[in-house]
């Protein structure tokens, strides 16, 4: 009996093992070819799946089986759940619909989830976003707010350009105020002798003649200013042979006595009074000052007027950078040039004298018309040196460069 029971048990175990092997074989047939131990890169599998061409295989059956195999290698259904596979498909489609510049940057970071992709795209938008600028424009009698962009550059008012006038000596510009011009007179000879500037031999004053020179300068400050504009600035040196023994040389002006501490410490101001050791040229004093217009100031009436007013009377107008004489009657804005005022008035009147011959659109400036005509001609003169992409405006090219540099 025991032997019979052992035989029946062994036969049952063999039958069950045969059934298990049969089931495993059927499952392997349904699953297809076994997976390789070393799984390839999912990104490479995705690219192979997307770039697969029908011409690479002999027929439709082989093409379909090849696509199935590439898709399984990419999605790996044996390792991933349905939700993970759906996430991969959504991520791929989301990357596909992104702009090319953003898509390239996101793929370079190799995100592992859709949340990472969204974070990268938001960071990119936050970095490239600028605060919008608005400008008020009068159109058909009504003020309208328009966003200021590169294409609307011609419609906006350019910032006022104020040229910097070069430094001129006192022969061309108006002299300093009386408070500044008299600073030199208020300093006594005792002060100049103790000044740290006078480390080298200084001009000697002849006894009681120095106070007389100071009194002469105070009595006639206009004469001092007029003669100070020319090379020999010491007016008392010519009155009856008094004053300094060695007058100033050519090229000196009245601004030199008012030396500040910065000028003392600079290398250019190491020897500020060395010119007293040289003599002026007599021929330079005798000929040019006779015909100089400042010499006629002594003969003019109204001696109480300031020297700047007399210069204006002689035709010396103030520089254009100091005034904006052209004023808009509508908004009160002032301009330096009349052409700027005319251009500004088009904002209020809505005048657009420049018309496009292709579509009939009108513009307020000729530069804006040229930018607009590039739309019709297809001209894109600004090209990126890294990727070769062309743009119509330089501002768009600058914004594109930020994508390469990651600004």
From Swiss-Prot:
Sequence position, cross-link Glycyl lysine isopeptide (Lys-Gly) (interchain with G-Cter in SUMO2): 26, 204, 230, 271
Tissue: Expressed in a variety of organs, but most strongly in adult testis and ovary followed by small intestine, colon, prostate, thymus, spleen, pancreas, skeletal muscle, heart, brain and kidney. Also expressed in umbilical vein endothelial cells, foreskin fibroblast and Hep-G2 cells.
Annotated region described as Disordered, given as residue ranges: 1-20, 150-270
Domain of life: Eukaryota
Molecular function, one GO term: protein homodimerization activity
Zinc finger (C2H2-type): 326-348, 354-376, 382-405
Family under the similarity heading: Belongs to the krueppel C2H2-type zinc-finger protein family.
The protein's name: Zinc finger protein 174
Source organism: Homo sapiens
Gene that produces this protein: ZNF174
């Amino acid at each position: 009996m025991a032997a019979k029971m052992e035989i029946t048990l062994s036969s049952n175990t063999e039958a069950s093992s045969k059934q298990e092997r049969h089931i495993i074989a059927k499952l392997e047939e349904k699953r297809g070819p076994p997976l390789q131990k070393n799984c390839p890169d999912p990104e490479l599998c995705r690219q192979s799946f997307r770039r697969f061409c029908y011409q690479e295989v002999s027929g439709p059956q082989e093409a379909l089986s090849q696509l199935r195999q590439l898709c399984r290698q990419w999605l790996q259904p044996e390792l991933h759940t349905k939700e993970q596979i759906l996430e991969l498909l959504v991520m791929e489609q989301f990357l596909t619909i992104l702009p090319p510049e953003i898509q390239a940057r996101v793929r370079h970071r190799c995100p592992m989830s859709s949340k990472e992709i969204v974070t990268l795209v938001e960071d990119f938008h936050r970095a490239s976003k600028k605060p919008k600028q608005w400008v008020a424009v009068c159109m058909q009698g009504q003020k309208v707010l328009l966003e200021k962009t590169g294409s609307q550059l011609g419609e906006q008012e350019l910032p006022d350009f104020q040229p910097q006038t070069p430094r001129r000596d006192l022969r061309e510009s108006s002299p300093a105020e009386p408070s500044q011009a008299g600073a030199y007179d208020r300093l006594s000879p005792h002060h100049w002798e103790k000044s740290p500037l006078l480390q080298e031999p200084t001009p000697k004053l002849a006894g009681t003649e120095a106070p007389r020179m100071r009194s002469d300068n105070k009595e006639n400050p206009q004469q001092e200013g007029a003669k100070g504009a020319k090379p020999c600035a010491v007016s008392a040196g010519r009155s009856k042979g008094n004053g300094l023994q060695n007058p100033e040389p050519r090229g000196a002006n009245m601004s030199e006595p008012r030396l500040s501490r910065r000028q003392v410490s600079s290398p250019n101001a190491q020897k500020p009074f060395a010119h007293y050791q040289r003599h002026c040229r007599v021929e330079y004093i005798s000929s040019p000052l006779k015909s100089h217009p400042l010499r006629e100031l002594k003969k003019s009436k109204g001696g109480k007027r300031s020297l700047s007013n007399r210069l204006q009377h002689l035709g010396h107008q103030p520089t254009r950078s100091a005034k904006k004489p052209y004023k808009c009657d509508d908004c009160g804005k002032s301009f330096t040039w009349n052409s700027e005022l005319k251009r500004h008035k088009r904002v209020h009147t809505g005048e657009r004298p420049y018309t496009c011959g292709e579509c009939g659109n009108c513009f307020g400036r000729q530069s804006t018309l040229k930018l607009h005509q590039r739309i019709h001609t297809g001209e894109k003169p600004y090209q990126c040196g890294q990727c070769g992409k062309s743009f119509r405006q330089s501002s768009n090219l600058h914004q594109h460069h930020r994508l390469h540099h990651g600004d």
